[in-house]
Amino acid sequence: MPRHAFRNGKHLNAVPETGGEETGFLMEKNDMLARALGNLPFRRNVRAREFTTFRIGGPVTFFAEPKDADELCAMLSAARSCDYPVYIIGNGSNLLVSDSGVEALFIRIGARMAGVGFDGTRLKCGAGALLCTAAKAAVAEGLAGLEWAAGIPGTVGGAVAMNAGAYGGEIKQVLKSVTVVECGRIAKKIVHAGDLGYRSSV
């Protein structure tokens, strides 16, 4: 049986069950990634039920939670150097992982990158902040525009990536700029509403 992970009804990955020679190859790739990650924080063979809201799913070979953008860059560079598959996730909502597991590095942008603060009349959030937390913080500060997000269980990063929306509101209506990791570099980008479409972003 193939190993699968799904998000929004789409395959995240499909890795066939392997025999002796291929299993040895995968083990070698796993060891290569472990060495490349070095002192970066990661765990091996973590069950997906630990990080999905459905609390189901088999083991993923590597699981990591960066504390900041620099650590995220380092993790992505390590995986790229080994040609190892990577999936970046947030709160684990809308995510199903097969009980068979997935051979990949799962990077969760979570509580370690979940800061919420203000810069004048602008709300600044880490990608790991819960969207509902950001919405409540905005209301408490008297800022309008994010009320529709109060009941959404995902993270700010996930909401930006898919241009989340509900009740007539969308992230693109309030998003002004983002800090992204792009080709191993950290960059800030100004965002225009036209850059985001229905459940999609650039």
What is the predicted role of each segment?
Residues 9, 19-20, 24:
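Residue-identity detector for glycine
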Residues 18, 99-101, 137, 163-167:
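N-terminal low-complexity, intrinsically disordered patches enriched in charged
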